[in-house]
Structures are given as structure tokens and as C-alpha cells.
Amino acid sequence: WLMKSEPDVWSIDQQKKAGNKGAPWDGVRNYQAAKNLRSMKKGDQCFFYHSNIGKEIVGIVEVTKEHYIDKTDQSGRFVAVTVKFLRELDKPISLEEIKKHKELSHLSLIKQSRLSVMPIDSKSWKILNKMGKI
């Protein structure tokens, strides 16, 4: 998985400070992104992507609680998951670097740039880990 957050709203540093308890990944109001949240399982790992400022993958988080009603959504239609910080990448991976890699050209990060929560296939996960020097 890959989850996007604007670093001035929620950054990897704030996620790290949340500790093992983790923090809710809430506020998602796109139906496709919400569907992706519903598909996440406890233990799934997700790349943490800083959007708008930086535009780069900066770390990895882990799902600690599967989807539940997002308390910030008064309609009760959208869900959240809880994630905890696992690690920062040794080398952040910029969107430009990802776009240059032919084997990653199919990613929703490139094809659906407005999507905030998206799946990452295992081959792409390995490539991105290598690019991030993990």
C-alpha cells in the first residue's frame, strides 16, 4: 500500500511520535481510497508519502487496526484505519525518480495522482524498497 499525507497536516515525524499505539488514518473522502482502506488487513505495510510538499516516499507504516467508521465523518460513510510508524527510508524516493522507472509506470501514484490511498504490488514494493535503500 501507499498512503499520502500533506506533511503540514500529518508528517512522518508526527507519525513517529505517535509510537506503537499508532494514529488513525482518517479524513479520506474519496470513495476509491476509502475502498482501499477497507481492503487493508492488520499487519499490512504501507509506504508513507509526503504529498504537495516534497512529493516523495519518506517511510513505512503498518496497519494495526483494520477499518472502522471515521469519527471525523459526520455521514458515517467513510472509514479510517490505525497505522503505526515502522521506519523512515534511508533515502526518500521522489515522485520524479518513480516516474523515471519504467517498471513503476503502472502505479496509481502516477496514473491517478489524486488518489490518496492505493495498492502497491509486490514487485513494485521490492523495487521501491531498493530505491529507498532498505
Task: Cite the ranges covered by each PLM segment.
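Aromatic- and Lys/Arg-enriched surface recognition patch
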Residues: 58-118
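Short, charged, solvent-exposed linker or helix-capping segments at domain edges/interfaces
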Residues: 14, 92-98, 129-131
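Short, charged beta-turn/beta-strand-edge "cap" motif at the junction between a beta-strand
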Residues: 49-55
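Compositionally biased, charged N-terminal/linker segments
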Residues: 1-40, 134
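Hydrophobic beta-strand signal
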Residues: 47-48, 62
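Charged phosphate-binding loop/patch that engages nucleotide di/tri-phosphates or the phosphate backbone
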Residues: 117-134
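Loop/turn positions that initiate beta-strands
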Residues: 43-44
